[in-house]
Amino acid sequence: MEHSFKTIAAGVVIVVLLLQQAPVLIRATDADPLQDFCVADLDSKVTVNGHACKPASAAGDEFLFSSKIATGGDVNANPNGSNVTELDVAEWPGVNTLGVSMNRVDFAPGGTNPPHVHPRATEVGIVLRGELLVGIIGTLDTGNRYYSKVVRAGETFVIPRGLMHFQFNVGKTEATMVVSFNSQNPGIVFVPLTLFGSNPPIPTPVLVKALRVDAGVVELLKSKFTGGY
């Protein structure tokens, strides 16, 4: 009888602990909307984990539709050889509170979308043309395992939330992909820019120790990112 009571008590404790964690799990994605639409008022000074809503009477049908990613940008406009056309809440106010956004990325031959992280979203993508090497790096839990595949037109990929990843055009022609996120504002952390182009700069001795190189190498790398991406 005593053993049975201890078993039940242990079970109750486990359930209570799981229930305590439930709010944390729920907050792992964008909050659920409380109305059909909440077109973002980008001029409003009120921002509480999102944007204030425009009055329904001020939001026409156009907030449901966008042609922004119908065409891409100049793939030679930056040293990466790629161009990102964003379609997050800042560019498409209609997605406010809906927990979704999209990007189009165009690549020159040999162009890359450098190693980066989306801290607030999982990413799902499809290659529209060309062929892209998609690389994903796991956490220490996986021994920093590197997963990769050449993804061709019509094929898809998924990037788990928060994992470092990149895309690289391995073809001889331009390539294009469209990606979707389960957040209206997925965020992005470019690893090279974060390390060597932060404002203010990360102290050189910190990077010397972390990267196991001399100060000259660190200063050279910092000089490459003074103007951002």
Swiss-Prot record:
Taxonomy, superkingdom: Eukaryota
SMART domains, per the entry: Cupin_1
Gene3D superfamilies: Jelly Rolls
SUPFAM superfamilies in the cross-refs: RmlC-like cupins (SSF51182)
InterPro entries named in the record: Cupin_1 (IPR006045), Germin (IPR001929), Germin_Mn-BS (IPR019780), RmlC-like_jellyroll (IPR014710), RmlC_Cupin_sf (IPR011051)
Keyword set includes Signal: yes
An example Gene Ontology CC term for this record: apoplast
Assigned keywords, A-Z: Apoplast, Disulfide bond, Glycoprotein, Manganese, Metal-binding, Secreted, Signal
Domain Cupin type-1: 67-219
Protein location: Secreted, Extracellular space, Apoplast
Residues the record lists as binding Mn(2+): H116, H118, E123, H165
GO molecular function: manganese ion binding
Signal sequence coordinates: 1-31
Disulfide bonding pattern of the chain: C38-C53
Residues with glycosylation annotation: N80, N83
KW Transport (keyword) present: no
Biological role: May play a role in plant defense. Probably has no oxalate oxidase activity even if the active site is conserved.
Family the UniProt entry places it in: Belongs to the germin family.
Assembly mode: Oligomer (believed to be a pentamer but probably hexamer).
Name the UniProt record assigns to this protein: Germin-like protein 3-6
Origin species: Oryza sativa subsp. japonica
